[in-house]
């Protein structure tokens, strides 16, 4: 799904509003995913998945850092996320559906924290962006 110039502007503006809260929102999105979609916990058997866990916060920071990198490389997501794609496809072997579940959880998290900025247009742009990130992360599964 191609991001239009308007989509790119919406994604950059929304992620700019996330700012210093990126790691916090990443962790909250993971917690939300684990609660809403319990089967996703199977990929984290060694984690303490309780609320506020340092491990969930740490992984949330990694998710946020990857998304921040992606926002900075909207015209070259495959290049920016190549190593992460290799990791998830070849080492971690994460079922691709889980990226959609995390994307949904992240959208809900962003909507709850940025209600005035989360317009239908921004929602659509972020959804397209996250779908593109998911596509890139699963591209090496084939």
Swiss-Prot record:
Phosphoserine (modified residue): where? 4, 36, 50, 103, 125, 139
Q: Where is the Globin domain?
A: 2-142
**Keywords, ordered alphabetically:** Acetylation, Heme, Iron, Metal-binding, Oxygen transport, Phosphoprotein, Transport
For the modification N6-acetyllysine, the affected residues are 17
Q: Where does O2 bind?
A: 59
Instruction: Report which superkingdom the organism of origin falls in.
Output: Eukaryota
Keyword DNA repair in the entry? The reply is no
Q: PTM N6-succinyllysine: at which residues?
A: 8, 12, 17, 41
Q: Tell me which residues bind heme b.
A: 88
Q: Name one GO molecular function term.
A: oxygen binding
One Pfam family in the UniProt entry: Globin
| Tissue specificity remark | Red blood cells.
Alphabetical list of InterPro entries matching this protein:
Globin (IPR000971), Globin-like_sf (IPR009050), Globin/Proto (IPR012292), Hemoglobin_a-typ (IPR002338), Hemoglobin_oxygen_transport (IPR050056), Hemoglobin_pi (IPR002339)
Keyword Transport listed? The answer is: yes
The modified positions for Phosphothreonine read: 109, 135, 138
Where Phosphotyrosine occurs, the residues are 25
Similarity-based family: Belongs to the globin family.
Q: What does this protein do?
A: Involved in oxygen transport from the lung to the various peripheral tissues.
Task: Give the record's subunit note.
Answer: Heterotetramer of two alpha chains and two beta chains.
- What name goes with this protein? Hemoglobin subunit alpha
Q: Which organism is it from?
A: Bos gaurus frontalis
Instruction: Give the gene symbol.
Output: HBA
